[in-house]
Structure formats: structure tokens, C-alpha cells
């Protein structure tokens, strides 16, 4: 919703929805950079001679909703935990029992490898064992990432003109997001343990739609990827709610 209203140049709603998302997933604060860039770009499209300072003076009220939501979160955190930035995460068992804290560079390598690991093979040709937490092969669980990476490379070669800033910004934000996630002690449950990673998908999907090539071949290839991704996540949903994984 934040991205949708940003593209509609409705900054108040865009920043308010972004604040809601950050309240749930603080790491999504990174994408505020993208939203502000797009809002400035949209303003300058309507006002070619306009400046960032003029935008601030004219649209200052855009931050009211965002600020109100942020203050409400901080007030709730203070009332519950005596700290405006603490929302209960540090009180979870996995964080109270560790000496290395919630975030630490020592987690980075292992967590990155978790996002590459394949399902474990069963003994004597038994069934594959899928992980239910802390990540697994991102390209297997969300094959749309394959399309996103491919489209980015295509656009870098074919569509640089007029897109260069976003072609640089989006992957940098995604990589920064990934590194922050992987410096977190846990990668979470659900979506085969890829829940945190999937938070970046709306923003990457925006890039995909913006840069994708035209033509039937692109559609045909992605139909195969769509069917594969849908099938494995349908199986995962059934398996999860039946407590098979």
C-alpha cells in the first residue's frame, strides 16, 4: 500500500502505510529511501521547476499520519516495556538465552547459507524433509526471485536510460536488507523459514514490472515459474496446517 500510494503521489497515505509496516518489521525502514525518491520524482514531474525544499514547504502535512503512527508505537512500547524502541522482541526466549544479542555479525555467514540450503533427503530414499524455520533455498520457495534477478540484469543492459538511479538503488536496498536480516539471530518461521526475506518482494516486484521485457517468451517462461512456485507453496501450506513440517 505504501508503494501504491507513492506511485499515486499521495505522500500522506504512502508514508502512513510505510510507518505501519516499519512498526511490524523495523528493517523495512530502509525502503523509506525509495519512497521519498519516488515522491520527489513525482512532484518534479508535476512541477518541473520545483525543488525539494518547495516540496517540503508545500507537502509538510504528508508526515502527520506517519508521525502520529510512530508516536503511538513509541507510547505503547514505553507503556509496556519502559523503552520507546522495545516492542518485546528482546524478551523472547531465543534472545534472553544468548550472549551475542539479537543482532550480531557472527550470525551472518550461517544465515546466508540457510537461504541456500536444500530440503534434507530422507534415509534410504525416503521423503524430502522441508525446513519450517530459519530459511531454506530462496529460489525454490519463491522462484519469482529468479525472474527479478534476470529482469534486473536485462534492464541493466537494455534499459539503463532513465532507469539508472532505480537500477542501482533497488538492489542496494535489497542487499542491505538481506544483510541486516542475516545478522539477526533467527530468520523466523512460516514460508519455510523465509518470512523475513519475503518482506522485500513488493519493492522488487515494482522493479520487475517497471523493467520487464515485452513479448510472449517472457510470459511463457514465467508461467512455468508461477506454476512451480504455486505448487510448492500449496504443498507447504497443507503440510504446515497438518503439522507435517
For each feature predicted by the language model, list its residue ranges.
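Membrane-proximal envelope and lipid/glycan-remodeling enzymes
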Residues: 1-245
